[in-house]
Design a protein with these regions (language model features):
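C-terminal regulatory/oligomerization modules of transcriptional regulators
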Residues: 94-166
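Alpha-helical residues within the helix-turn-helix
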Residues: 33, 50-51
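Conserved segment of winged-helix/HTH DNA-binding domains
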Residues: 71-96, 111, 117-121
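Key DNA-contact positions within bacterial/archaeal DNA-binding proteins
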Residues: 40
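Short amphipathic alpha-helical interface segments
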Residues: 10-22
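A short alpha-helical element within helix-turn-helix/winged-helix DNA-binding domains
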Residues: 26-36
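Beta-hairpin "wing" of winged helix-turn-helix
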Residues: 52-62, 66-68
């Protein structure tokens, strides 16, 4: 599993915009310089974030990008799925069946169960992390993760996760 550059840089741009004190927001050149990315790539990422409803743009000489809603309302799981999708897409088995039209393991597939459990746990965590959490302190997501781990020992069951996803 890998985090794509679009997910990483898109999230970094969003954190940078959230931390901007200027009411005009940040322009593409400002974001480009701050993150060390090309203006073209920043524009592409900004378009994806704008289409996802996370940022608004103000055109013109003094224009820029601002958050479309308060940072505490922007859920990181939604941001990452907008930028790149799920780690394990439910259609994965249909598109990665090798030379056959149908995966030979489609009825009994232990690797699919593993990916579904990992996706479930990642979703549970990322659904609790907001842009506000990331733009204020690195400790906040760690605290959320610790709380989730405490809950997981009480409530998560691999049988429930897999059967709910099939």
């Amino acid at each position: 599993m890998k985090i794509t550059s679009q997910e990483e840089y898109g999230l970094r741009l969003l954190i940078r915009i959230a931390g901007c004190k200027d009411k005009q927001g940040m322009s593409i050149p400002q974001l480009s310089e701050a993150e060390g990315l090309s203006s073209h790539y920043v524009a592409k990422l900004a378009r994806v974030l704008r289409m996802g409803g996370f940022i608004n743009s103000t055109p013109g000489y003094k224009g820029g990008y601002v958050l479309a809603m308060p940072a505490d309302k922007i859920v990181i799981n939604k941001v990452l799925k907008t930028l790149g999708g799920s780690l394990f897409d439910k259609d994965f088995c249909e598109t990665h069946s090798g030379k056959l039209n149908l995966c030979t393991n489609s009825v009994e597939c232990s690797s699919r169960s593993l990916w579904q459990m990992i996706q479930f746990i990642v979703d549970q965590f990322l659904d609790q992390v907001t842009l506000h959490d990331l733009s204020n302190s690195e400790k906040k997501p760690v605290n959320i993760f610790d709380e989730l781990l405490d809950q997981s020992t009480k409530t998560f069951s691999a049988k429930n996760i897999v059967s709910d996803r099939l």
